[in-house]
Regions:
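Microtubule-binding structural modules
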Residues: 2-318
Length: 318
C-alpha cells in the first residue's frame, strides 16, 4: 500500500513551512546554504516577501512556493507555473539575520583575504530592497549594510597584529547622473581640485598593475573607525536621497544608492616583512524596476522610471 501523492506533497510542504517558523532551524538551514556558497564567485539569492497592505486589502493570492533550498515556483493567473533554480531562496518569514548570513558573511571573509566584493539588492519597486539592505529602527530589523559594517569592525578590533584604515564613500545615481552624498549641500569641489576640473563626477577605469581599478573622479572619502561612523553617513545620505510616491510604493526610491568601503591593511612580520592589501566592498540599494501601467507614473515620475529601467538593463550585459 502506498501513500497518496497529494498527501505526500502536503506533508513535505508542512515540513518546509515548519522549518521557517522555527528560528533555530531556519538559521541552521541558512548556515548549510552559506557553506555551499562560500566558494561561489557570484551568488543569486531570492528573498520572498509577504503580501503588503495593499495586496491584502485587494485579497490577492500568494504566487510563490518554495520547493527546496534553491528552487522557487511562481504561479501567475492564466499561465502555467514556472520553476526557477537559484543559489538560494529565502522564505518570507526569514529574519534579517538570516539574510545577512546568506548574502554577506562569506563576502566579508574574502574581503579580509584581499578580494573585492559587491552586494546588491535587485527587484521590482516595493519588493523590500531598502528594508533588506538598510532595515528598520530595531536591532533585530537591521539590514545587510549595518550588520556587515558591524562584522567588519568587530573583525578589525580582534586583529591586533595588523593596522587597518577604512574609508567610506557614498554616491547616488539619479536619472543617469552621479551625486556625491558625502559632499555638503551646495559644495563646489572645483575650489579644491583647481580650475581645470569641471565639477562633474566621472567613472574611470585604471587598468594599471596595482592601480585604482574602477573609481569616480572628484568624489569625497571619509575615514570611518567604527560602525556608528558608517551608519551616521548612511542616515545622512538616505535623508538626501530622492524618493517619491507611486501606486505601488508610497516611499519609492527614485535613485540607486552605492556605499563603498575601502579597507587597507598593513602587516609587518619578521618573515615576510611589510605587506599591504587594499580591498573594496560595494553595497548597493538599487531603485526598483517598474512598469508605468502598474505604478501609474506620469510626468517626472515617468521619466525617473525610464531612467531607472535603463540603468538596470545594463546588469544583463555583464
Amino acid at each position: 500500500m502506498t501513500d497518496n501523492l497529494p498527501e505526500i506533497e502536503e506533508k513535505e510542504h508542512r515540513m518546509r513551512s515548519a522549518s521557517y517558523h522555527n528560528p533555530d532551524r531556519l538559521l541552521r538551514h541558512v548556515s548549510s546554504m552559506h557553506r555551499a556558497l562560500t566558494d561561489t564567485q557570484v551568488c543569486v539569492a531570492v528573498r520572498v516577501r509577504p503580501l503588503n497592505t495593499r495586496e491584502i486589502e485587494a485579497q490577492s493570492n500568494k504566487c510563490t512556493e518554495l520547493l527546496g533550498p534553491g528552487t522557487l515556483k511562481i504561479t501567475t493567473a492564466g499561465q502555467d507555473p514556472k520553476t526557477f533554480h537559484l543559489d538560494a531562496v529565502v522564505h518570507e518569514d526569514a529574519p534579517q539575520e538570516a539574510i545577512f548570513h546568506l548574502t554577506a558573511k562569506h563576502i566579508i571573509t574574502k574581503i579580509f583575504e584581499g578580494y573585492n566584493g559587491t552586494i546588491f539588492a535587485y527587484g521590482q519597486t516595493g519588493s523590500g530592497k531598502t528594508y533588506s539592505m538598510i532595515g528598520g529602527d530595531e536591532t533585530s530589523e537591521e539590514g545587510v549594510i549595518p550588520r556587515t559594517c558591524r562584522r567588519i569592525f568587530d573583525t578589525i578590533a580582534k586583529d591586533t597584529e595588523k593596522t587597518y584604515l577604512v574609508k567610506a564613500q557614498m554616491v547616488e545615481i539619479y536619472k543617469e547622473k552621479l551625486k556625491d552624498l558625502l559632499a555638503p549641500e551646495g559644495f563646489d569641489l572645483r575650489a579644491e581640485e583647481g580650475s581645470k576640473w569641471n565639477g562633474k563626477l566621472l567613472i574611470r577605469h585604471d587598468k594599471s598593475k596595482g592601480g585604482k581599478g574602477i573609481y569616480i573622479t572628484g568624489i569625497r572619502e571619509k575615514i570611518v573607525t567604527n560602525t556608528k561612523d558608517v551608519l551616521d553617513l548612511v542616515q545622512s545620505a538616505t535623508d538626501k536621497r530622492v524618493v517619491g510616491e507611486t501606486n505601488m510604493n508610497s516611499e519609492s526610491s527614485r535613485s540607486h544608492l552605492v556605499l563603498s568601503l575601502t579597507i587597507s591593511c598593513q602587516h609587518v612580520t619578521d618573515v615576510e616583512g611589510y605587506t599591504r592589501t587594499v580591498s573594496k566592498l560595494h553595497m548597493v540599494d538599487l531603485a526598483g524596476s517598474e512598469r508605468a501601467k502598474a505604478t501609474g507614473a506620469t510626468g517626472a515620475r515617468l521619466k525617473e522610471g525610464a531612467a531607472i529601467n535603463k540603468s538596470l538593463a545594463a546588469l544583463g550585459k555583464y
